[in-house]
Amino acid sequence: KSLFPRNLISKHWDIYPDNFKKSLFNSDKIKNFRSNDLSFKFNDSLEKGMLLRTKRALEKLTKITGREFIEKNKETMIGNPKTFYIDNEYYDYHDLFIIYFYHSLVSFLSEKRDKEIFFVCEIGGGYGGLIHRIKKNFPGAVCLLFDLPEQNYISNYYLKQLNPKAKVLNLESLMSMKKTKSLDSMKIERDDLKKFDYVILPGYLIEKIHNSFIDIFINTRSFMEMNLETVYFYFSE
């Protein structure tokens, strides 16, 4: 975290105390992160009065996608989310929104399906719920996540729990692979990443992507939570 430029952390996300890693590295808390403070601010299900809101969200989403699409793409197990039993099935409010976002992207992702490998980059992906759907349905996608270190730790846990055999590249393994102890002159090339399923890195390293090879960039809502300097940084890259 000490490497992350302070000017790229907005007030909205400057919420983690110095001792937060004690909670983050607590095995019981990480197993239940979708029902505790570890997912604060990137999990709408933690809000109060969620039963009625979940019913309404399910009803609206069903009209858009159909119930079969929801059942195929929901994920209500990892992280012990706060679910509600509706119409003989369990649903998580935040999960329904992720399904909506995924449904909105399917047509764009399908355009890349014929490529053996294509690169999808999500900025501010939270615990990895959306990128999981993308990888599940489009196995040829190499999925990049750029976010704060705390979220990266949680998304790494979440995605590995869903797919223990997934090949994940993080900052430590990237530096080892590039045989460097310094980030200053590092360049991230297409060939560095093509053998991985997930690449999970701190947001500021997006500027190290060399000879832009990303096929699809995604940001669902976190740009509105960033300061203008941070938004400009991402758009300039």
Regions found by a protein language model. Name each.
Residues Y127-F138:
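Conserved SAM-binding loop of SAM-dependent methyltransferases across substrates and taxa
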Residues Y158-H210:
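S-adenosyl-L-methionine
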Residues I218:
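A conserved beta-strand element that flanks and buttresses the S-adenosyl-L-methionine
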